[in-house]
Regions:
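Active-site microenvironment of metallo-dependent hydrolases
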Residues: 1-21, 25-26, 31, 39-41, ...
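Divalent metal-coordination and catalytic microenvironments
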Residues: 8, 23, 28, 51, ...
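Active-site gating loops and adjacent loop-to-helix segments of metal-dependent hydrolytic enzymes
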Residues: 69-101, 135-143, 208-235, 255-258, ...
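Alpha-helical scaffold segments that flank or form the walls of functional sites
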Residues: 71-137, 156-165, 412-421
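Metal-coordinating catalytic core of metallo-dependent amide/deamination hydrolases
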Residues: 127-245
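Histidine/acidic-residue-rich catalytic or RNA/ligand-binding cores of hydrolases
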Residues: 208-220, 248-252, 270-279, 296-313
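His/Asp/Glu-enriched, well-ordered alpha-helical/loop segment
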Residues: 228-235, 277-360, 377-380
Length: 421
């Protein structure tokens, strides 16, 4: 399958220069990015982009797709109460099939937001993988070892199985939280990382309560504790990282770890504001994630981008902190770097994960600076087209995912009502 996008404003993300040109795709790879040129190629489809913007798709570097069933069911409470009173009890009722359908709903929402990859952590990886493959969507799974259900053996099996099967799916070692795992369990994950020389990810330093409890228990911050156990000897990183000391950040810099910030979720749960400017000053690779639809509650990278820069400016009392260019990198190329994916920029040889943003809408006019428009005034309504792995899955408000959308909504509602009984 060969697709030609022409008459396009092109933002490659290799830099922020935007030019009028073309992007050619063959099968799942980009084969040309540049100015208009003649070619003897025969294309299966040629798309006039009408001087709208074509750019790399967003990478949602932290989410829980299967939690769509909790959207607006448990709100207006802090993290620990939310988890212990609402989330954990109802999760015991979930079936693999439930998670499959709930994940499909999340993927639809990712597509409308221009998200072409998600880094997903939830209870049943098989269900999320099946949903992703059925919809031809790119997903990186993260192990979610904890003391209640998922074992280290489960994660090792998934790591070996799902890094071989399909180019749309990959699997990263991980565990849910420091406080939901015994020291022995975390040491087992670290041993697995050493065995495969593989990175590890987890939720980390999300709340003051978590940090203080870890210090009382171990005498160390969560970051120091995990480093002491050898968790990060082969890299990786963490989600949230809201309450980080200077020493914590130095450890992340020293070990070349990645941080995924989740501003909307951290605001809604009153967890705090991550010190993004301080992280950037230490040249830590920062990515952007929505967190799950239960704690956010929407899967919208435009909102995350605006909040990432806006909250950093507020926290530092500095209007120049964390500018639009830094945030766009967090949403694209930085996520690709953290997840070791061959995407995040538009250039020949990269995976054909790209989006078209509608510039012919009031919120994107006038065109002084398109990159800033995306971050400061862009919205999901500007997403005209989302291509994943060379296939258009969303275009002009229509999904091309192989099933009736309303039928999925009905199925999800039926399953949610069963869980609520």
């Amino acid at each position: 399958m060969r697709t030609r996008f022409y008459n396009a404003r092109v933002l490659t993300m290799k830099d922020f220069d935007i030019f009028l040109g073309e992007v050619w795709v063959e099968d799942n790879k980009i084969i040309y990015v540049g100015k208009v040129k003649d070619s003897s190629f025969c294309f299966d489809r040629e798309i006039d982009v009408q001087k709208n913007l074509i750019m790399p798709g967003f990478i949602n570097a932290h989410t829980h797709s299967g939690m769509t069933f909790l959207r607006s069911m448990a709100d207006d409470m802090p993290l620990q109460q939310w988890l212990n009173e609402k989330v954990f009890p109802i999760e015991t009722k979930l079936s693999e099939e439930d998670i499959y359908y709930f994940s499909k709903l999340a993927i639809l929402e990712y597509l409308t937001s221009g998200i072409t990859t998600n880094f997903d952590m939830y209870l049943n990886p098989e269900a999320i993988i099946k949903a992703s493959l059925d919809m031809k969507y790119r997903t990186v799974l993260c192990g979610a070892v904890n003391d209640f259900c998922l074992s280290v053996e489960d994660v090792e099996r998934c790591f070996n199985e799902y890094n071989q099967e399909n180019s749309l799916i990959s699997y990263v070692l991980g565990f849910s939280h420091e406080y939901t795992n015994s020291k022995e369990k975390i040491q087992q994950v670290a041993a697995l990382s050493h065995k495969y020389k593989a990175p590890v990810y987890t939720h980390l330093s999300e709340t003051e309560y978590e940090v203080n409890t870890c210090k009382e228990k171990t005498g160390l911050s969560p970051v120091e504790y995990l480093c002491d156990l050898g968790v990060y000897d082969y890299g990786g990183g963490a989600f949230h990282c809201v309450h980080m000391s200077e020493h914590d950040l130095d450890l992340f810099k020293e070990k070349h770890l990645n941080i995924v910030t989740n501003p909307a979720s951290n605001l809604k749960l009153a967890s705090g504001i991550a010190p993004i400017q301080a992280m950037l000053q230490k040249k830590i690779n920062i990515c952007l994630g929505t967190d799950g639809p239960a704690s956010n509650n929407c899967l919208d990278m435009f909102r995350e981008m605006f909040l990432a820069t806006g909250l950093a400016k507020y926290k530092n009392c500095d209007a120049s902190a964390v500018d639009a260019y830094e945030v766009l990198k967090m949403a694209t190329i930085n996520g690709a770097k953290a997840l070791n994916l061959n995407c995040g920029v538009l250039e020949a040889g990269k995976l054909a994960d790209l989006i078209i943003l509608d510039l012919h809408q009031p919120n994107m006019q006038p065109i002084h600076n398109i990159a800033k428009n995306i971050v400061y005034s862009g919205s999901k309504s500007n997403v005209k087209c989302t291509m994943v792995n060379g296939e258009i899955l969303y275009e002009d408000g229509h999904f091309y995912v192989g099933f009736e959308i309303d039928a999925l909504y009905d199925e999800v509602q039926k399953r949610v009502e069963r869980l609520m009984r």
